[in-house]
Amino acid sequence: MELNKYIDHTLLKADATSADIKKICDEAIKYDFKSVCVNSCYTSLVKKSLENSSALVCTVVGFPLGAMSTKSKAFEAKTAIEDGADEIDMVINIGKLKEKDYDYVEKDIQAVRDATKGKVLKVIIETCLLTDEEKKKACEISVKCGADFVKTSTGFSTGGAKVEDVKLMKDTVADKAMVKASGGIHSREEALAMIENGADRIGASSGIKIVEG
């Protein structure tokens, strides 16, 4: 198994500097990771840093709370793509999901989907804040909107990826979308457990540790 090709090499901390971002790009090239995942202000820097590699540019949108306006999310996604993003990881509006305003949640995702045509869209549902039924509903709405992936977590809330959530999400989306596990995955064993239970992609800041075992 080419574990490196499952890894979105990630740095989303508020205090990340341009030098830090360049460093993870160099690491992504060295280890041949699938992508580098960053906040949107660094999209163009990552694009430039990865121009001679196969690694993709992944940018987060509405991160980490998902509570910004739909127009703002769509604009951030559109701008990220203009700056060179190949993939967009957006956060759903969690509060609206929990109050069962599914129409809002759908329109929110759809607006970002419409702004990202031709690019990969991953929808972060923040599993640690949801019941199993809410997780299923979030996955169903994401699929309905044409998301390419559903993703467990931001890594900035009360918990990260769990094997049981990955399995639930995979069972829900079946072959209609892929699953990205992220948040708290620090070892090869943890990454393999996620993959064995349905994860198609791993988001981690510990990518080197994961592939080196």
Curated annotation (Swiss-Prot):
It comes from the Bacteria. It is found in: Cytoplasm. GO terms for molecular function: deoxyribose-phosphate aldolase activity. SMART domains: DeoC (SM01133). It catalyses: 2-deoxy-D-ribose 5-phosphate = D-glyceraldehyde 3-phosphate + acetaldehyde. Pathway: Carbohydrate degradation; 2-deoxy-D-ribose 1-phosphate degradation; D-glyceraldehyde 3-phosphate and acetaldehyde from 2-deoxy-alpha-D-ribose 1-phosphate: step 2/2. The keyword Cytoplasm applies. GO terms for cellular component: cytoplasm. GO terms for biological process: 2-deoxyribose 1-phosphate catabolic process; carbohydrate catabolic process; deoxyribonucleotide catabolic process. It holds the Pfam family DeoC. HAMAP family: DeoC_type1 (MF_00114). Catalyzes a reversible aldol reaction between acetaldehyde and D-glyceraldehyde 3-phosphate to generate 2-deoxy-D-ribose 5-phosphate. This is Deoxyribose-phosphate aldolase. The gene is deoC.
